[in-house]
Amino acid sequence: MEKKILYINKKDADKVRGVHGIALLRKVKILKISEEERDTLPEEAELLKFIGFSSQEVGNFLQDMKKLGIRVNLKCMETEHNKDWSLKVLHKELMEEHAFMKGEQKE
């Protein structure tokens, strides 16, 4: 399966260039989204979705990001469960998961 990433970041062009640079070096296709779909997300939205990657390949990609000082809190691998979710739903789920992992879950 071809490796692809979807990286959304509306505010930090340097991070976008860094993530895209890693993808290009690793021969990973960079997916684009429409402005219409991007507009369904909050202005501060940032997320990274890995498609067609093994766990080890994701780990290697994240190591490259770490070397460049790039941190993305909301990230996931595409699964059968989430592959058809809209970006809005994916972002919401990742926000909830991130809050849970940080111990900020709602009672």
Placement of each model-derived feature along the sequence:
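Glycine-rich, often proline-containing surface loops adjacent to acidic residues and nearby aromatics
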Residues: 1-4, 41-46, 71
